[in-house]
C-alpha cells in the first residue's frame, strides 16, 4: 500500500490529480501544472512536501559519524542552519542528496528524498551496528519521516507572507539558515530553503499522522492542517496557489536542479551503459569537502584520474519538441547520451532538459540533437538556470 502524508484527505478533496510518486500518494496538481508553476514564478505557491524524509542524529559523536558518511563539511554550519551534502556508497555513487541542519546540543536533522529515506536509515543503522569504528559511538539515529509535516512556500511573495505570518524577514536569513517560529501557538522549524529556484521558506511541524505505519501513533493532524489553511488564507492577497508535484518538477527543471532517481542514483541503468552516478558526473563537486575522509572518497579520486566518461549537461530545444526521460541524444550523427529529465517549460514555452552525455560534450554552446518520436530535433547545451536570473529566481532584480 502506498504511503500517505498527514494531509492526504485534504489533498484528495482539493487536488484534480493524485498519483503515486516514490511510493507515496501525492497531489500532482490542483488547477493545472502551468497555473501553479507560474504562480510560483510570479507570486507564491504552497507545496506539501511531507513525503520528504527526516532522520535525527543525536549524541556527542553525531558530528563525527556524519562527517564520515557524507561528503560536505558538516562542522561548518552554526546552529541553527544547514548545509547541502551527499551520501555516497563505497564506489562513489550517490545514495542521495541531503540537507543537514545543525540543531545545536549535538543534534542534527537530515532531510532526504522521499524514496531514499528508508534506505538511508537502514544504511546508517547498519554502519553503526557493524562497523568497528562506529559501534561504540555516543549516537542515536531516529527516523521521523512519518511524524513531521513539511510545507514549502515558494515565490517572490514568500517574503511578504513570512512577514505576515511569523513577523520575520527571510531575506535577513542566509540560505539554509533556520529558526524556531510560532503560528497561533503552534511551534515549528522554519528554514530559508526550497527546490524551485525562487526565494522561499519551508516549515517542519511535528504532528499526528492518520496514516502513520505505526497504528499506535495515528491521529488527526490538527496542527499541520491549521498551519496549511492559515498559509493559504493569509496568502490570498498575494495570489497564492496550492501546488502539486507536477509544478515542483517543472520548476526545479527550469532552475536546473537534479532529481534523485533521474540525475542522481545508485545503479542508474541507462542505454548508454551508465550504471551509477557520482558527484563528479552530476556537477555536484561543490558539495564535496576534500580535506576529510568520507565513504566513497577513494573511488572519486580514482575516477578523477581515469576520466568521468559521462557527465550531466543542460540543454534547450531549438526545434519544436518536448524532450522526455530516456530519449537519445546525438552530436554529429553519433549517439552521445540520453535525456534524464525533460519538459516543456511553462515559463519559456520551449522544450528544456538535462542529459547524460559523453564528457567532451558536457559544456554550454554545443549543438546536439534529441530523438523525439523517431525524428532528431536540434537543441543546444546551456548553462542553468533556463530563465533570465535577472527577471526570475532567487536573485531577480525586478
UniProtKB/Swiss-Prot annotation:
Write the Enzyme Commission number(s) for this entry: 2.1.2.10
**Entry-linked InterPro entries:** GCS_T (IPR006223), GCS_T_bac (IPR022903), GCST_C (IPR013977), GCV_T_N (IPR006222), GcvT/YgfZ/DmdA (IPR028896), GcvT/YgfZ_C (IPR029043), TrmE/GcvT_dom1 (IPR027266)
Q: Does the keyword Nucleotide-binding apply?
A: no
Q: Name one GO biological process term.
A: glycine decarboxylation via glycine cleavage system
Disulphides: none
Query: Mind telling me which Gene3D superfamilies this protein's record contains?
Result: Aminomethyltransferase beta-barrel domains (3.30.70.1400), Aminomethyltransferase fragment (4.10.1250.10), Probable tRNA modification gtpase trme, domain 1 (3.30.1360.120)
Query: Which keywords label this protein?
Result: Aminotransferase, Transferase
Spell out the Pfam families in the cross-references: GCV_T, GCV_T_C
State the reactions this protein catalyses.
N(6)-[(R)-S(8)-aminomethyldihydrolipoyl]-L-lysyl-[protein] + (6S)-5,6,7,8-tetrahydrofolate = N(6)-[(R)-dihydrolipoyl]-L-lysyl-[protein] + (6R)-5,10-methylene-5,6,7,8-tetrahydrofolate + NH4(+)
Entry keyword Transferase: yes
This molecule's function is given as: The glycine cleavage system catalyzes the degradation of glycine.
Q: Which family would the database say this protein is a member of?
A: Belongs to the GcvT family.
Q: How does it assemble?
A: The glycine cleavage system is composed of four proteins: P, T, L and H.
Cite the PANTHER family for this sequence: AMINOMETHYLTRANSFERASE, AMINOMETHYLTRANSFERASE, MITOCHONDRIAL
Which named protein is this? Probable aminomethyltransferase
Supply the source organism for this entry.
Answer: Pyrococcus abyssi (strain GE5 / Orsay)
